[in-house]
């Protein structure tokens, strides 16, 4: 039997995302002109949908090496070059040199467009949206979510939540929107506040900007821009069944990430995740990162280090949640109801294949399609993009 991930890998090189049928592409008049494309997805069966896309020039793997050489001012020949196709990536979206003001305007326009279009796909007016939860590894501004919501025409009183927990940020945002058990004493219960309301949840990752000052060759080859936003009505179009929250600090510095967001370091209740009320309508959820000592944006260990960081914990959490799910299905009298598909973070293909192998040893097996070949690792955006690409195939 084929591995559930290997069976889904595209054998032929992927064309540019902008050339994909159904993608609405334009050039934003910022700097020299920035390509920007979105694809709209809606499931009439499930009554929900969203938009996903990217911005910046689409580089294939050969072109990417030339781009990195120009950015670093040195050759990429030798041991530092990855076999990116084997890692599941054919393309990445990157930006030319822009000023800080241009980066801000670009990501504000991209974010506002994503929110407007995600609302429209779901048949909502922007003025009807009552919650916006966005995950970002390194926001271009502390109040980015507030700014894009305002620019998109979403009411001022709508609850805005910024989530900064690296690649987990968008799924952390979705978890907050659905699971009322995540609330702590004295703080707003986000899931209860948003139950039955029209909510936009997503991940927006300007990783070309984020890595523009990095010197780490692994990071420069893997990461790129990407975003995805879905519309949900918590408790109706999507509801929480079972789940698990797990925190693990990267003590060894296998993936060092600079925190470009407020974090006091108070470790309330011993948690690595800090929740603060940035404004009456704005909640910030910020995770503690192992920051690079040299002040650079990002420093990565090699592929073996990434496997060590992601696989062991990921497999354990999935195993625990699967046990809870199976127990729930037995209680509901549907013990044979299996998981139809798993939407997984696309850090790289080899990591996901190893996760699937380890889960299979534990008797856990379900499809985990590889869906982001023309994006690269887009951190918090990857699950949202993967979900939207899989959405037309999901049945109720």
Predicted regions and their residues:
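Hydrophobic pocket-lining "lid/loop/helix" segments that shape and contact the acyl-thioester
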Residues: 22-36, 40-42, 103-123, 127, ...
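Conserved beta-strand elements of the Class I
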Residues: 47, 130-133, 198-200, 340
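Gly-rich Lys/Arg/Thr-decorated short loops/hinges at beta-loop-alpha junctions or inter-strand turns
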Residues: 85-100, 299-309
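A general structural motif
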Residues: 126-129, 156-158, 196, 336-339, ...
């Amino acid at each position: 039997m084929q591995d559930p991930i290997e069976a889904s890998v595209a054998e032929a090189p992927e064309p540019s995302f902008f050339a994909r049928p159904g993608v609405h592409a334009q050039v934003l008049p910022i700097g020299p002109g920035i390509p920007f494309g979105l694809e709209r997805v809606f499931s009439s069966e499930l009554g929900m949908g969203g938009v996903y896309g990217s911005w910046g020039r689409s580089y294939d793997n050969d072109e990417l090496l030339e781009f990195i050489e120009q950015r670093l001012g040195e050759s990429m020949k030798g041991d530092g070059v990855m076999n990116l196709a084997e890692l599941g990536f054919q393309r990445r979206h990157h930006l030319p040199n822009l000023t800080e003001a241009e980066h801000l305007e670009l990501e504000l326009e991209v974010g506002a467009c994503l929110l407007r279009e995600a609302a429209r796909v779901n048949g909502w007016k922007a003025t009807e949206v009552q919650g916006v939860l966005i995950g970002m590894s390194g926001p271009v501004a502390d109040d980015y979510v507030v700014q894009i919501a305002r620019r998109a025409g979403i009411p001022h009183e709508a609850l805005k939540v910024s989530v900064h927990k690296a690649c987990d940020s968008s799924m952390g945002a979705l978890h907050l929107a659905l699971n009322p058990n995540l609330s702590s004493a004295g703080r707003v219960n986000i899931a209860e506040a948003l139950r039955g309301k029209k909510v936009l949840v997503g991940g927006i990752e300007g990783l070309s900007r984020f890595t523009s000052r990095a010197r780490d060759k692994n990071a420069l080859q893997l990461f790129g821009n990407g975003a995805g936003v879905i519309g949900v009505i918590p408790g109706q179009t999507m509801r929480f069944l079972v789940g698990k929250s797990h925190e693990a600090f990267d003590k060894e510095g296998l993936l060092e990430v600079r925190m470009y967001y407020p974090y006091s370091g108070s470790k309330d209740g011993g948690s690595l995740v800090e929740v603060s009320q940035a404004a009456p309508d704005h909640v910030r959820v910020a995770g503690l990162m192992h920051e690079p000592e040299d002040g650079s944006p990002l420093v990565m260990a090699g592929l073996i280090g990434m496997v060590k960081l992601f696989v062991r914990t990921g497999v354990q959490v999935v195993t625990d949640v699967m046990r809870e799910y199976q127990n729930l299905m037995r209680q509901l009298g549907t013990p044979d109801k299996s998981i139809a598909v798993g939407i997984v973070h696309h850090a790289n293909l080899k990591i996901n294949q190893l996760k699937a192998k380890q889960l299979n040893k534990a008797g856990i097996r379900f499809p985990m399609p590889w869906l982001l070949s023309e994006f690269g690792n887009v951190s918090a955006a990857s699950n949202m993009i993967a979900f939207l690409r899989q959405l037309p195939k999901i049945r109720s």
